[in-house]
Amino acid sequence: MITIDESRNNLFDALGLQRLKDSYMKEDESSPQERFAFIARQFCADDEPLAQRLYDYMSQHWLSPSSPQLSFGRTKQGLPIACFLPYLHDTARGLIDTWAEVSELSMIGGGIGLGVGIRQPDEKSVGIIPHLRTYDASCTAYKQGQTRRGSYAAYLDISHPEILSFLNTRRVGGDHNYKLLNLHNGVNVPDSFMKKIWILSTLAPFVKMDPCPTTETLFKKAVTTLKDSRYFGADDRWLGEVSFAALAEQLDVVNRWDLIDPHTGKVKETIKATELWERIILTRAETGEPYIHWIDTSNRALPQFQKNLGLSIRQSNLCSEVVLPTDETRTAVCCLASLNLDYFDKWCNNEQFYLDVATYLDNVLQYFIDHAPPTLKRAVHSARSERAIGIGALGFHSYLQSKMVDIESLPAYLINKKIFKTISSHLERVNLELGELRGEAPDCVGTGRRFSHMTAIAPNATSSIIMGNTSPSCEPFRANIYKQDTISGSFVTYNKHLKRLLEERIPDNQARERVWSSIKMHDGSVQHLNQLTVQEKKVFKTWPEINQLSLVMLAADRQKWIDQSQSTSLFFNPDERISYVHKIHLKAWLHGLKTLYYFRSRKILTVDKVHHTTTTADPKTENDCTFCEG
């Protein structure tokens, strides 16, 4: 029997409490504490002390379950898995089996990250667009409970002959027969393409320069920087022979990018790499997508024991934080939960906490293996073989603000490293401990590991609201005050750390309300306030006000301790120069990020955050993925 503490309801704000009631609690549950206790009992594997500890972690907001776990039990067919990664194999059986699998997954509440491995149109194939149109339509065909419709993303290699058509599927205008407005899209980008972009962006400016000792010295330094990079190897010896005099002709050769039919291996067309890259950047600016998956970076990080089995990563998932091997026999499974960094100081050295969280997700995974229908045999095979889980985080920006640390400062970088190094080291120990107690995953035989992967940082915007209105994932707050509409009414939400500061600084209630009104009028920004110091204004910068390179470098630093990926979104002003946007994207690849999620803009942000409308009765109003919440 779990001992429930109703006083922990005070940890919710009004919006978080209402969101939990509207979207996750069962009709016969009168308190959020009952919901947490139910989840703890379901996934404790009959270990009552574990159930009590899991309840305590959730009710104290240390641990956030993913959405399918949080809503578990509301429907008979639901399974506690957030997202699935099927691979669309280029055979008749592969096409049929994947369609059946995806339909089943949509009905049980899973988001889809589809790897597209089929050929361009020929005498036997209609190409990718007609197939993807069926998936686009099915997004609206399956309603998952009361809160959302199905949601899919498709990933295509950047060398596929239909890549340009694929990039146009979500853009405004054009033939409606080639539009996929319900289907998110992502692009697999290899190092070979990014090296071309890096070379061209580094050396192209010299083409227009007059030869002189200064420019030739700068040119040689630029070439040396490229040659010395870890991305360049034996195949790039030609860089040593690049000449200033013949640079234009040499760069024309570099700029050639072959589009290759994956079925025949034949080059179907050659286009300019720079034009394709610019199309990707502009499409992201216009639509927020495609997501970018640097597939070679992901595969380099794949554990050697899985490489030895001939496995490889072919795509990411709906929210770009999961990178696991897939093929015609494996549909990767996302089994997620998040640690609330707002409480990092309380649980960071609690060894039992890490063991319990990993055990909890292992139990969730086993429940899926035991209860999944036969249609999901590929997903069950993947889950059983690698037992991958994704322990993530939320509340990073909130934690920094609680310490009055500016997210762009050196202390923030040091805290970032400390947090994720601490989590990783504890989980490595737990992986071996559970491997000894419960046995190695089949993929991991000989390593002592229970899990092939243990960490992935999901976007978890909804979870952050429920978990005490903390900041989502590792993203900054988008505004310090915003209004959110739900089916139960409107809520004005305040940054809790700023609220505490203003209550201390401005005792008069009416004066304080005038300050909040002023913040609201400035799109949630505090940069205009005379009542705050320069340092305090830095601490409470909103996402649009933060240098995106700082966010990329923070993500790159923590990636060293994350064995999967992160849902890393970037914000740019609508009038931002494309050269700056290119620079940030290039830096993300150079510094080892595996994926980029959404491209945000102020136009979207103003609507999305200062007046954030999410009427949960209408799935069309939910722009962000909720499957990986956790």
From Swiss-Prot:
Gene3D superfamilies: 3.20.70.20. Pfam families: Ribonuc_red_lgC (PF02867), Ribonuc_red_lgN (PF00317). Keywords: Deoxyribonucleotide synthesis, Disulfide bond, Oxidoreductase. The active site is at residues 317, 319, 321. The record marks 625, 628 as: Interacts with thioredoxin/glutaredoxin. Substrate binds at residues 67, 82-83, 111, 317-321, 459-463. It comes from the Viruses. This is Ribonucleoside-diphosphate reductase large subunit. It comes from Invertebrate iridescent virus 3 (IIV-3).
